[in-house]
């Protein structure tokens, strides 16, 4: 099992969670404005310590309905070169504006396809 970062993180990217992770399993794109964080499912130890630190509730335990988020995380890390993040950074500039919006991945990032 692993934890996954879900749609709530898209266009917000609060990073409170990364500093509490005991195994440093969070990743981000190289650009400052990359749209979200992901958890490396091969590194996550399923401790859940990050969950209460996410101010928008974007981190959830893996479940059948969230498998697509596990696959996206793997794709971003393995095929798009996302790098490990271990220190808290400022959230994206419009994070407060987008934090309550639903279905953000499909609206704004849907063109990002998972590699086969």
Swiss-Prot record:
Write out the entry's keywords from A to Z.
3Fe-4S, 4Fe-4S, Electron transport, Iron, Iron-sulfur, Metal-binding, Repeat, Transport
Q: Which PANTHER family match?
A: FERREDOXIN, OXIDOREDUCTASE
Domain 4Fe-4S ferredoxin-type, first and last residues per copy:
2-31, 35-64
Source species, please? Rickettsia conorii (strain ATCC VR-613 / Malish 7)
Q: What is the lineage of its organism?
A: Bacteria, Pseudomonadati, Pseudomonadota, Alphaproteobacteria, Rickettsiales
Where does this protein hold [4Fe-4S] cluster?
Answer: 21, 44, 47, 50
Q: Which gene encodes it?
A: fdxA
- What InterPro entries would the database entry show? 4Fe4S_Fe-S-bd, 4Fe4S_Fe_S_CS, 7Fe_ferredoxin, Fd_C, RnfB_subfamily
Q: Where does [3Fe-4S] cluster bind?
A: 9, 17, 54
Could you tell me what this protein does?
Ferredoxins are iron-sulfur proteins that transfer electrons in a wide variety of metabolic reactions.
**UniProt keyword Iron-sulfur, yes or no:** yes
Under what name is this protein listed? Ferredoxin
**Cofactor note, please?**
Binds 1 [4Fe-4S] cluster. Binds 1 [3Fe-4S] cluster.
Cofactor(s) in the UniProt record:
[4Fe-4S] cluster; [3Fe-4S] cluster
Q: What's the domain of life for this entry?
A: Bacteria
Q: Name one Pfam family in it.
A: Fer4_7
SUPFAM superfamilies tied to this protein: 4Fe-4S ferredoxins
Q: Single GO molecular-function term?
A: 4 iron, 4 sulfur cluster binding
């Amino acid at each position: 099992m692993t934890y996954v970062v879900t749609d709530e993180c898209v266009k917000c990217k609060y990073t409170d969670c990364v500093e509490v992770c005991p195994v440093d399993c969070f990743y981000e794109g190289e650009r400052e404005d990359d749209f979200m964080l992901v958890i490396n499912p091969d590194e996550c130890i399923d401790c859940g310590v990050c969950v209460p630190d996410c101010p928008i509730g974007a981190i959830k335990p893996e479940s059948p309905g969230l498998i697509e988020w596990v696959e996206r995380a793997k794709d971003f890390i393995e095929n798009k070169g996302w790098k490990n993040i271990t220190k808290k950074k400022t959230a994206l500039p419009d994070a407060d504006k987008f934090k309550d919006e639903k279905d953000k991945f499909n609206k704004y990032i849907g063109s990002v396809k998972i590699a086969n």
